[in-house]
Amino acid sequence: MELDYNKVALKDLSLVWPEASKLIDKSLKHSQGQMNLDDILDMLSKDYLSLFIGYSKEGIDIAFTTQVIIYPTYKALRIIHLGTTDGLDYEAMEVIVDMIADSYDCKRIELYGRKGWEKALVDFNYYYAGTILMKDLKEI
């Protein structure tokens, strides 16, 4: 399935957010309480994060937030939150993400996610690059 995609402009955020937030909300179940939907909307409205959507005639099929990370030697597109409709073709998603990364002249895509993403994206040249360890010092 081929999807059209757009970066959501700040002026259009209120129009798209009700539908896109349902997909973004799926990713929050695995985010260790770092943010909620209100936090994400606030960060989007302040342009700290960017929201991209992929859509078909049925509606929004993928929604994800990103940041461009600038390292001394390269830029990376970091995917912060990503939610899809059930059964989305990962190849369609991959085409969108690659084009967005290329438009920012990024040399790498970073995606922190649950273990299932590693298996789902291995065919698209994603690889395991480390482990995130956490220690709660106070109740979150």
What does each model-found stretch correspond to?
Residues 1-35:
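Short amphipathic alpha-helix that is part of the acyltransferase structural core
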Residues 31-49:
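Active-site rim helix/loop that mediates acceptor-substrate recognition in acyltransferases
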Residues 60, 103-105, 127-129:
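Short glycine/proline-enriched coil/turn segments at helix->beta-strand junctions
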Residues 74-122:
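Acyl-donor binding region in acyl/amide transferases
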Residues 111-115, 119-140:
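Active-site/acyl-donor-binding loops of N-acyltransferases
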